[in-house]
């Protein structure tokens, strides 16, 4: 067993790449270690293309084992189940980073599995998994020539932090992950606290500078440990077939791509495709027999060339816009009468109905991870039904990876403006229903979420808007597109989503299909996105620019009380009897804390006011000189104890009773008396006198 190792430093932390010791039957197997974190990443490459495959079947699976953190899983089976949303997001991050580095037309299946074997809690293992995925690919024999690496960058007190730990990130205004090759940037994912575009760009370039150390180490490992390159073929469009289709149908295709309506355009294109198939099948084009798949791929290539060349030549885009124009926007709030907050955001042929629901602490999501169980007060869910693109499909299933990814992006975009628990005690769930989609539904979700929360009275710090930028690049010539359509995303080279407030960026997500982009393109895309974002915010602000002061009449009420911690036991009562009585009488939810915090959550104001009044009565402090209506709770030889407030009793001597003209032998437990608090001694003992009738 021969083991190869590479060691390098990243942000003053030593990282070790090792191969040859584990999972040796995989085509590529690398363990990545940093401190007590260990991630095993394997790559398996199929040596042939499966019949009928017309895409690159790359799959990435990031898995966390609870034993890595010295824990036993919960649940009846006591074993790991389906991956969590966080694990799915990390799988997507790795996939998006490495996918652009494979040659076009490579259709061999590749499966990458990253398994967290040991975890120390200080650093997230996601970057180690990304580095390991690249290293295992580099030694697997796959056609992976442009080695990729990734790093995380933070930003605190005006300085960038390389490879920040979890504590660093808590204090950071930026959580940025960048991956790329030695020469270019491939993927960006970030969450930020309304930072200027210049800071975001600086962070991306800072990250890229430090990628080179990792890439050099991976290359050194591959030089000594790589398997021979597999034999593979590249699928290519038949040029003669393409020319034949173009000669007969190009005029029709060109005219069709001037139709702004997506549905009308697709109907016309489908008709042309049908005619193309009939033409090729009925004529002896060059003595060859072509499959329907080959014909349609050649047709698609003509579409791609046409759309791209039009844009690069400065001609109008598919829907007639120039590169910087935003589609028409329509904004409505309060569109659903029975919900707590709602908004309908429409941009061109993309429409999101976003609904906000307010809840109590008990509605918070409990998220289990290697770090333990975390309470999530802000949830954002994204649904993409098939009718949104005019198709039939499965409905009501578990969310797909794409839906999870889009929800996470929208949440990251709005997280920076979401109020903390002290300022806003509600738990909030936002749901985005995509009703129509023709590009950038995730950014419509960002805009709709901001509007919907403001409609619900959630005190977000600033409205947030998002925009998707695209890129068409051919050699040195390129065009950056604002607010891309679905076809421009599909046929273009970049999908760059930028969200933020009027002050700066709150989230970035960039994916590209080419071998990387330059600083110049990034700079232009960020500036163009800033202008577009401010335009969108301006339209949103015409409808609502700050949160409503009051929640909806149908929304639940919440009230937070801070009482003397010693009084919590009085509110709860023996065995919880007191608090249960309040709940049964008012219908409110009551949560208490040893710190003295009491949260009252009720379905309406009447219920809440009643519960608050009952609690205030229990915790009220007896004051000297005040008159109270109490009840006798105990008879003694020399006097009686009278309950005044809650569990507070006072002593009333018989002498005081007789002085007021009342006979002591007529007193019984439960009898009401009006008494005056004469004094309260240092021990808290209360002396009473009877108020004369």
UniProtKB/Swiss-Prot annotation:
Essential cofactor(s): Mg(2+)
SUPFAM superfamilies attached to this UniProt entry: Eukaryotic type KH-domain (KH-domain type I) (SSF54791), Nucleic acid-binding proteins (SSF50249), Polynucleotide phosphorylase/guanosine pentaphosphate synthase (PNPase/GPSI), domain 3 (SSF46915), Ribonuclease PH domain 2-like (SSF55666), Ribosomal protein S5 domain 2-like (SSF54211)
Task of the protein: Involved in mRNA degradation. Catalyzes the phosphorolysis of single-stranded polyribonucleotides processively in the 3'- to 5'-direction.
Matching Gene3D superfamilies: GHMP Kinase, N-terminal domain, K Homology domain, type 1, Nucleic acid-binding proteins
Protein name per its UniProtKB record: Polyribonucleotide nucleotidyltransferase
Domain of life: Bacteria
One of the record's GO cellular component terms: cytosol
Quaternary state and interactors: Component of the RNA degradosome, which is a multiprotein complex involved in RNA processing and mRNA degradation.
Chemical reaction(s) catalysed: RNA(n+1) + phosphate = RNA(n) + a ribonucleoside 5'-diphosphate
EC number, UniProt record: 2.7.7.8
InterPro entries documented for this protein: ExoRNase_PH_dom1 (IPR001247), ExoRNase_PH_dom2 (IPR015847), ExoRNase_PH_dom2_sf (IPR036345), KH_dom (IPR004087), KH_dom_type_1 (IPR004088), KH_dom_type_1_sf (IPR036612), NA-bd_OB-fold (IPR012340), PNPase (IPR012162)
Entry keyword set: Cytoplasm, Magnesium, Metal-binding, Nucleotidyltransferase, RNA-binding, Transferase
Family: Belongs to the polyribonucleotide nucleotidyltransferase family.
KH domain sequence ranges: 556-615
Subcellular localization(s) per the UniProt record: Cytoplasm
Gene Ontology MF, one: magnesium ion binding
Pfam family, one: RNase_PH_C
Enzyme class of the recorded protein, top EC level: transferase
GO biological process, one term: RNA processing
Binding site for Mg(2+): 489, 495
PROSITE patterns: KH_TYPE_1 (PS50084), S1 (PS50126)
């Amino acid at each position: 067993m021969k083991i190869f190792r590479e060691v390098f430093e990243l942000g003053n932390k030593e990282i070790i790449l090792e191969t040859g010791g584990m999972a040796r039957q995989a085509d590529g197997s690398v363990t990545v270690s940093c401190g007590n974190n260990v991630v095993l990443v394997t790559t398996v490459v199929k040596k042939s293309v499966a019949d009928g495959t017309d895409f690159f079947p790359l799959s990435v699976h990031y898995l966390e084992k609870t034993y890595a953190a010295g824990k036993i899983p919960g649940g009846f089976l006591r074993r790991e189940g389906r991956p969590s949303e966080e694990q799915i997001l990390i799988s997507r991050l790795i996939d998006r980073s490495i996918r652009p580095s494979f040659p076009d037309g490579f259709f061999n299946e590749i499966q990458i599995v990253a398994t967290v074997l040991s975890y120390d809690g200080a650093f997230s293992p996601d970057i180690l998994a990304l580095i390991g995925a690249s290293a295992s690919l580099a030694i697997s024999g796959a056609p992976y020539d442009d080695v990729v690496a990734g790093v995380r960058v933070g930003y605190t007190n005006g300085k960038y932090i390389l490879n920040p730990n979890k504590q660093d990130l808590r204090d950071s205004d930026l959580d940025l992950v960048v991956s790329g090759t030695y020469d270019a940037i491939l993927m960006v994912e970030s969450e930020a606290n309304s930072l200027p575009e210049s800071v975001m760009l600086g962070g991306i370039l800072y990250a890229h500078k430090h990628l080179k150390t990792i890439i050099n180490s991976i290359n050194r490992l591959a030089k000594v440990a790589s398997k021979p390159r597999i034999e593979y073929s590249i699928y290519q469009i038949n040029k003669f077939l393409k020319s034949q289709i173009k000669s007969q149908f190009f005029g029709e295709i060109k005219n069709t791509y001037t139709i702004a309506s997506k549905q009308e355009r697709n109907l016309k294109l489908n008709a042309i495709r049908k005619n193309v198939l009939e033409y090729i099948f009925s004529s002896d084009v060059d003595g060859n027999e072509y499959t329907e798949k080959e014909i349609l791929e050649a047709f698609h290539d003509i579409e791609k060339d046409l759309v791209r060349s039009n844009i690069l030549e400065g001609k109008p885009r598919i829907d007639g816009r120039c590169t910087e124009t935003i589609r028409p926007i329509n904004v409505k709030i309060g569109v659903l009468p029975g919900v707590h907050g709602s908004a309908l955001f429409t941009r061109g042929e993309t429409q999101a109905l976003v609904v906000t629901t307010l809840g109590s602490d008990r509605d918070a999501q409990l998220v289990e991870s290697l770090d333990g169980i975390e309470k999530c007060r802000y949830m954002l869910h994204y649904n993409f039904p098939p009718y949104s693109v005019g198709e039939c499909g499965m409905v009501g299933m578990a969310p797909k990876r794409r839906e999870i990814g889009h929800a996470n992006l929208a949440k990251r975009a709005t997280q920076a403006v979401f109020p903390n628990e002290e300022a806003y005690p509600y738990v909030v769930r936002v749901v985005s229903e995509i009703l129509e989609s023709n590009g950038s539904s995730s950014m419509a979700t960002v805009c709709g979420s901001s509007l919907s929360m403001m409609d619900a009275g959630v005190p977000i710090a600033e409205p947030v808007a998002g925009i998707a930028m695209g890129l068409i690049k051919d050699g040195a010539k390129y065009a950056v597109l604002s607010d891309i359509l679905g076809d421009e995303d599909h046929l273009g080279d970049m999908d760059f989503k930028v969200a933020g407030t009027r002050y700066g960026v709150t989230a970035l997500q960039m994916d590209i299909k080419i071998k990387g982009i330059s600083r110049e393109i990034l700079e232009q895309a960020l500036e163009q996105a800033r202008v577009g974002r401010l335009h969108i915010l301006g339209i949103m602000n015409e409808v609502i620019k700050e949160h409503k002061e009051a929640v909806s009449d149908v929304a639940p009420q919440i009230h937070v009380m801070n009482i003397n911690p010693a009084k919590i036991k009085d509110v709860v009562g023996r065995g919880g009897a007191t608090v249960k009585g309040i709940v049964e009488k008012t219908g409110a939810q009551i949560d208490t804390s040893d710190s003295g915090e009491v949260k009252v959550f009720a379905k309406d104001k009447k219920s809440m006011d009643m519960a608050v009044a009952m609690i205030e009565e229990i915790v009220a402090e007896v004051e000297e000189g005040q008159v109270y209506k109490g009840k006798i709770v105990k008879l003694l030889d020399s006097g009686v104890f009278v309950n005044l407030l809650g569990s507070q009793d006072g002593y009333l001597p018989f002498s005081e009773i007789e002085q007021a003209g009342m006979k002591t032998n007529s007193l019984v437990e439960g009898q009401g008396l009006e008494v005056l608090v004469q004094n309260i001694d240092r021990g808290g003992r209360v002396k009473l006198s009877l108020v004369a009738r």
